[in-house]
Amino acid sequence: MHLTVLDAPTEWSRFAEGSVERRMLLALGDLLGTPLRPKPLMLPDGSRVEVEGIDRACRVLVQLVGNQGAYKPAYRNKVMADMFKLLWLRESVPTAERAILLVSELIVQALGGWVARAATDLGIEIHVYDGSTVAPLRPLSRPDVKRP
């Protein structure tokens, strides 16, 4: 199944000027050297889904988890849902080459255990927004395990 990328009604869709989501996309676009904007996509049956960031060539797909404030365990579910969405979108947009999950520093907590490893194994890049710039997630340290 292939999705069709549609023109958005406005350049930034639901991301208001000054919103954390807009700042996140601008910072990631600066890092990658390509503008990223939210876009609606149409499925063959006419239903729609939005990707929170995509470049003009439709090669880079981005989902954002930009929550601020106190950490809530439910944020881990949002991370996993967005990873699942990115996998599907990468397979459904014929030109897609990269799938990036961009998270705020707060959300890094949700990437503990197997979640970050699964993202890496599935080819999903994780980047972290620190409030002004974006950098790839540093590999999580692994405890030394001595095997007999």
Name each region found by the language model.
Residues 65-121:
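Catalytic cores of nucleic-acid endonucleases
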Residues 42-43, 68, 133-135:
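Residue-level detector of flexible, active-site-proximal loop/helix-junction positions
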Residues 37-38, 99-100, 127-129:
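Regulatory, intrinsically disordered low-complexity regions in eukaryotic nuclear proteins
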Residues 51-64:
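Active-site beta-strand-loop-beta-strand hairpin of nuclease catalytic cores
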Residues 12, 84-87, 106-148:
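Non-catalytic C-terminal interaction segments of nucleic acid-processing enzymes
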Residues 1-43:
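Acidic-basic catalytic patches of nuclease active cores, encompassing PD-(D/E)XK
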Residues 47-49, 84:
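Alpha-helical scaffolding within the catalytic cores
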Residues 31, 56, 121-123:
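Short, well-ordered coil/turn elements that cap or connect secondary structure elements
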